A protein has these predicted regions:
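Polar, enzyme-active/binding microenvironments
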Residues: 1-187
Length: 187
Protein backbone atom coordinates (compact mmCIF):
# COMPACT_ATOMS: atom_id res chain seq x y z
CA UNK A 1 0.00 0.00 0.00
CA UNK A 2 1.40 3.36 -0.95
CA UNK A 3 1.43 6.68 0.83
CA UNK A 4 4.01 8.63 -1.07
CA UNK A 5 4.59 11.45 -3.51
CA UNK A 6 7.23 9.30 -5.18
CA UNK A 7 6.92 5.53 -5.07
CA UNK A 8 8.78 2.88 -7.01
CA UNK A 9 8.02 -0.83 -6.94
CA UNK A 10 10.75 -2.70 -8.74
CA UNK A 11 12.22 -6.00 -9.81
CA UNK A 12 15.93 -5.92 -10.55
CA UNK A 13 19.24 -7.77 -10.62
CA UNK A 14 22.87 -6.79 -11.14
CA UNK A 15 22.66 -7.05 -14.95
CA UNK A 16 20.74 -4.83 -17.35
CA UNK A 17 17.40 -6.46 -16.50
CA UNK A 18 15.24 -4.17 -14.40
CA UNK A 19 11.74 -2.80 -14.43
CA UNK A 20 9.62 -0.73 -12.08
CA UNK A 21 6.26 0.91 -11.75
CA UNK A 22 6.84 4.54 -10.77
CA UNK A 23 4.39 6.96 -9.19
CA UNK A 24 5.98 10.39 -9.60
CA UNK A 25 5.29 13.65 -7.76
CA UNK A 26 2.48 14.54 -10.17
CA UNK A 27 0.81 11.21 -9.41
CA UNK A 28 1.37 9.89 -12.95
CA UNK A 29 2.26 6.23 -13.31
CA UNK A 30 4.95 5.00 -15.66
CA UNK A 31 6.86 1.81 -16.26
CA UNK A 32 10.59 2.36 -16.04
CA UNK A 33 12.90 -0.07 -17.72
CA UNK A 34 16.69 -0.22 -17.55
CA UNK A 35 16.83 1.34 -21.01
CA UNK A 36 14.34 4.14 -20.40
CA UNK A 37 10.81 5.07 -19.46
CA UNK A 38 7.48 4.35 -21.07
CA UNK A 39 4.41 6.30 -20.00
CA UNK A 40 1.41 4.10 -19.22
CA UNK A 41 -1.36 6.61 -19.83
CA UNK A 42 -1.83 10.26 -18.94
CA UNK A 43 -5.17 9.64 -17.19
CA UNK A 44 -3.75 7.15 -14.68
CA UNK A 45 -2.86 8.78 -11.39
CA UNK A 46 -1.75 7.12 -8.21
CA UNK A 47 -3.01 8.06 -4.78
CA UNK A 48 -2.60 7.24 -1.11
CA UNK A 49 -3.89 3.76 -0.40
CA UNK A 50 -3.10 2.32 -3.83
CA UNK A 51 -1.91 -1.28 -3.85
CA UNK A 52 0.95 -2.01 -6.24
CA UNK A 53 1.53 -5.57 -7.40
CA UNK A 54 4.28 -7.63 -9.03
CA UNK A 55 3.61 -10.99 -10.68
CA UNK A 56 6.83 -12.55 -12.00
CA UNK A 57 7.00 -15.74 -14.06
CA UNK A 58 10.62 -16.80 -13.58
CA UNK A 59 10.33 -19.55 -16.22
CA UNK A 60 9.39 -17.16 -19.04
CA UNK A 61 10.82 -13.89 -17.65
CA UNK A 62 7.45 -12.13 -17.92
CA UNK A 63 6.90 -9.39 -15.35
CA UNK A 64 3.44 -7.97 -14.68
CA UNK A 65 3.32 -4.68 -12.76
CA UNK A 66 -0.04 -3.66 -11.40
CA UNK A 67 -1.93 -1.10 -9.38
CA UNK A 68 -5.22 -1.89 -7.65
CA UNK A 69 -5.53 -5.21 -9.50
CA UNK A 70 -5.00 -3.74 -12.98
CA UNK A 71 -1.79 -4.83 -14.71
CA UNK A 72 -0.06 -2.39 -17.03
CA UNK A 73 2.29 -2.35 -19.97
CA UNK A 74 3.50 0.68 -21.87
CA UNK A 75 0.46 2.28 -23.49
CA UNK A 76 -2.19 -0.08 -22.13
CA UNK A 77 -3.84 -1.52 -19.03
CA UNK A 78 -4.43 -5.01 -20.39
CA UNK A 79 -1.84 -7.22 -18.69
CA UNK A 80 -3.09 -10.68 -17.75
CA UNK A 81 -0.67 -12.70 -15.62
CA UNK A 82 -2.96 -15.77 -15.52
CA UNK A 83 -2.90 -16.12 -19.32
CA UNK A 84 0.67 -14.79 -19.68
CA UNK A 85 -0.39 -12.06 -22.10
CA UNK A 86 0.72 -8.43 -22.33
CA UNK A 87 3.45 -8.36 -19.67
CA UNK A 88 4.88 -5.06 -18.47
CA UNK A 89 8.30 -6.33 -19.52
CA UNK A 90 10.02 -9.59 -20.40
CA UNK A 91 13.39 -10.01 -18.74
CA UNK A 92 16.00 -12.78 -18.75
CA UNK A 93 14.48 -15.91 -17.22
CA UNK A 94 16.10 -18.17 -14.61
CA UNK A 95 18.27 -15.53 -12.92
CA UNK A 96 18.34 -14.21 -9.37
CA UNK A 97 16.25 -11.07 -8.87
CA UNK A 98 15.39 -8.75 -6.00
CA UNK A 99 12.04 -7.13 -5.36
CA UNK A 100 12.02 -3.73 -3.72
CA UNK A 101 10.02 -0.68 -2.77
CA UNK A 102 11.38 2.83 -2.75
CA UNK A 103 9.72 6.00 -1.46
CA UNK A 104 11.65 9.18 -2.05
CA UNK A 105 11.72 12.95 -2.32
CA UNK A 106 8.84 15.31 -2.87
CA UNK A 107 7.14 17.81 -0.64
CA UNK A 108 5.06 15.33 1.37
CA UNK A 109 5.82 12.46 3.65
CA UNK A 110 6.20 9.14 1.91
CA UNK A 111 5.95 5.56 2.96
CA UNK A 112 4.71 2.16 2.05
CA UNK A 113 3.70 -1.14 3.59
CA UNK A 114 4.87 -4.29 1.84
CA UNK A 115 2.74 -7.43 1.96
CA UNK A 116 4.43 -10.58 0.69
CA UNK A 117 1.38 -12.51 1.85
CA UNK A 118 1.49 -11.97 5.60
CA UNK A 119 -1.26 -9.36 6.08
CA UNK A 120 -3.93 -8.33 3.56
CA UNK A 121 -4.98 -5.46 5.85
CA UNK A 122 -1.65 -3.70 5.34
CA UNK A 123 -1.20 -3.18 9.09
CA UNK A 124 -4.89 -2.35 9.60
CA UNK A 125 -5.13 0.20 6.77
CA UNK A 126 -7.41 -1.93 4.55
CA UNK A 127 -10.28 -4.37 5.05
CA UNK A 128 -8.88 -7.90 4.93
CA UNK A 129 -8.83 -9.48 1.48
CA UNK A 130 -8.33 -13.04 2.68
CA UNK A 131 -6.96 -14.35 -0.63
CA UNK A 132 -4.32 -17.08 -0.72
CA UNK A 133 -2.45 -18.74 -3.58
CA UNK A 134 -3.29 -22.17 -5.08
CA UNK A 135 -1.33 -23.87 -2.28
CA UNK A 136 -3.36 -22.08 0.40
CA UNK A 137 -0.40 -19.87 1.32
CA UNK A 138 -0.61 -16.16 2.06
CA UNK A 139 -3.13 -13.48 2.94
CA UNK A 140 -3.46 -11.11 -0.02
CA UNK A 141 -5.84 -8.20 -0.60
CA UNK A 142 -6.50 -9.22 -4.23
CA UNK A 143 -6.79 -12.75 -5.60
CA UNK A 144 -3.43 -14.21 -6.63
CA UNK A 145 -3.36 -14.67 -10.43
CA UNK A 146 -3.87 -18.29 -11.50
CA UNK A 147 -0.53 -20.05 -11.85
CA UNK A 148 1.32 -17.71 -9.46
CA UNK A 149 2.38 -18.47 -5.89
CA UNK A 150 3.34 -16.37 -2.88
CA UNK A 151 7.07 -15.68 -2.65
CA UNK A 152 7.97 -17.81 0.39
CA UNK A 153 9.86 -20.96 1.36
CA UNK A 154 6.71 -23.04 1.83
CA UNK A 155 6.13 -22.77 -1.93
CA UNK A 156 9.58 -24.15 -2.77
CA UNK A 157 9.72 -27.80 -3.83
CA UNK A 158 10.57 -30.36 -1.15
CA UNK A 159 14.18 -31.39 -1.03
CA UNK A 160 14.88 -35.06 -1.69
CA UNK A 161 17.63 -35.45 0.91
CA UNK A 162 17.31 -33.83 4.31
CA UNK A 163 16.22 -34.02 7.94
CA UNK A 164 12.51 -34.20 7.12
CA UNK A 165 12.88 -36.82 4.39
CA UNK A 166 13.29 -40.61 4.40
CA UNK A 167 16.53 -40.19 2.42
CA UNK A 168 19.34 -38.82 4.61
CA UNK A 169 22.78 -37.49 3.65
CA UNK A 170 24.53 -40.17 5.70
CA UNK A 171 22.79 -42.82 3.55
CA UNK A 172 25.20 -41.80 0.79
CA UNK A 173 28.38 -41.10 2.76
CA UNK A 174 29.98 -43.43 5.25
CA UNK A 175 33.32 -44.01 6.91
CA UNK A 176 34.82 -47.47 6.52
CA UNK A 177 37.70 -48.61 8.69
CA UNK A 178 40.17 -50.60 6.59
CA UNK A 179 42.64 -53.04 8.08
CA UNK A 180 45.56 -53.95 5.83
CA UNK A 181 45.97 -57.62 4.92
CA UNK A 182 49.79 -57.62 4.99
CA UNK A 183 52.40 -56.50 7.47
CA UNK A 184 53.65 -53.53 5.42
CA UNK A 185 50.12 -52.18 4.87
CA UNK A 186 49.85 -52.98 1.18
CA UNK A 187 46.91 -54.75 -0.26
Amino acid sequence: QANANHLTTMLYNASADACAILNNSAGNLSIRQQSGTGVLASSITGSTGDIYQIAFDCDTGKVFLGRNNTYYRVGAADGDPASGTNPSKTITANKEYCIGLSCYGGSGAGGGIINYGQDSTFAGNKTAGGNSDANGVGDFFYAVPTGFLALCTSNLPDITIGPGQSSQADDYFDTILYTAASSNGTH
